[in-house]
């Protein structure tokens, strides 16, 4: 434990928190071919592989995931939310931060309803999270 004088001289340093979505913190200067520090809420990328993964214990399922090469050159694993999707290799997608608790290493979500990603069909609740359009009212 430091003495009072040591604290007066040096003070306490605040711990720096590491980002939960580090790939969104980097940009890319294509002229200089260097990464830059440029935070973004989302990033565009191209799917390099679309596959399924099994979750950690005690869960059991086939979670849909995609390996995405971002516009800053970083390749990440991202989760495809919702039921059914139209993604394949070379699809252009938008990713956001947000981990999937039972898939280790999956720290990003694909945004549904933007770029090449279609919204979830026949979705009636929480539509904005899945890029689903408002359904037409039924005729009476």
UniProtKB/Swiss-Prot annotation:
One Gene Ontology MF term = rRNA binding
Alphabetic keyword roster: Methylation, Ribonucleoprotein, Ribosomal protein, RNA-binding, rRNA-binding, tRNA-binding
Q: Does the keyword Ion transport apply?
A: no
Query: Which branch of life, at top level?
Result: Bacteria
Question: Which residue stretches belong to region Disordered?
Answer: 1-44, 120-140
InterPro entries in alphabetical order: NA-bd_OB-fold, Ribosomal_uS12, Ribosomal_uS12_bac
The answer to whether keyword Ribonucleoprotein applies is: yes
A Pfam family that the UniProt record links to this protein: Ribosom_S12_S23
Q: Name one GO cellular component term.
A: small ribosomal subunit
UniProt biased composition (Basic residues): 121-140
Residue list for modification 3-methylthioaspartic acid: 102
What protein name does the entry list?
Small ribosomal subunit protein uS12
Which organism is this entry from? Lachnoclostridium phytofermentans (strain ATCC 700394 / DSM 18823 / ISDg) (Clostridium phytofermentans)
